[in-house]
UniProtKB/Swiss-Prot annotation:
Keywords: Cytoplasm, Ribosome biogenesis. It comes from Allorhizobium ampelinum (strain ATCC BAA-846 / DSM 112012 / S4). NCBIfam families: PRK00521.2-5 (NF001802), rbfA (TIGR00082). It comes from the Bacteria. Pfam families: RBFA (PF02033). One of its GO terms (cellular component) is cytosol. The keyword Protease does not apply. GO terms for biological process: maturation of SSU-rRNA. This is Ribosome-binding factor A. One of several proteins that assist in the late maturation steps of the functional core of the 30S ribosomal subunit. Associates with free 30S ribosomal subunits (but not with 30S subunits that are part of 70S ribosomes or polysomes). Required for efficient processing of 16S rRNA. May interact with the 5'-terminal helix region of 16S rRNA.
Length: 137
C-alpha cells in the first residue's frame, strides 16, 4: 500500500529543503544570476518544499519592494537551471540534484487577512470586553 500524498514531510525532506533554501539564498546574495530584475530586487525565500523523492524543490519567494511579483517569479524560473547548477556544489551529498521551481509566497498576505479579520469590529463585538481583559492578564 502506498503512502498518502498529503502526509507531513519527513525529517529528511525538511533537512534537504533547508539546505536547498540556504544554497539558493547564497547564489542570489552573491549576484551570480545575471538578470537586471533579479539583481535589483531583494528576494526573500521563506521555504523550500521537497517532493517525496527529493527530485523537485519548490521555493516559495517574496520579492520585496516590487509590486509585480509575477515578473520576478518568471525571471527566477527562467534561470532555474542555472541556479540548479550553481547550488550543486553545496549539495554534493545528494544522489540527484533537484529541479528548482519558484512560486510566489502568499503566506504573508494570508496572515494579514487573518489579522485584519481578528481585529474587525464584528469579531471584537463577539468576543466582548470580558474576554479581552482576561487575555491581557
Amino acid at each position: 500500500m502506498s503512502k498518502p500524498t498529503n502526509s507531513a514531510p519527513s525529517q529528511r525532506m525538511l533537512r534537504v529543503g533547508e539546505q536547498v533554501r540556504a544554497a539558493i539564498t547564497q547564489v542570489l546574495q552573491r549576484g551570480e544570476v545575471r538578470d537586471d530584475l533579479i539583481e535589483k530586487t531583494v528576494i526573500s525565500i521563506s521555504e523550500v518544499r521537497m517532493s517525496t523523492d527529493l527530485k523537485v524543490a519548490t521555493a516559495y519567494v517574496s520579492p520585496l519592494g516590487v509590486s509585480d511579483h509575477d515578473t520576478v517569479i518568471a525571471a527566477l524560473n527562467r534561470h532555474a537551471k542555472y541556479i540548479r547548477g550553481r547550488i550543486g556544489g553545496q549539495l554534493r551529498q545528494m544522489k540527484y540534484m533537484p529541479e528548482v521551481r519558484f512560486r510566489d509566497d502568499t503566506s504573508f498576505d494570508n496572515y494579514q487577512k487573518i489579522d485584519a479579520l481578528l481585529r474587525s469590529p464584528e469579531v471584537a463585538r463577539d468576543l466582548g470586553p470580558d474576554e479581552d481583559k482576561q487575555e491581557d492578564e
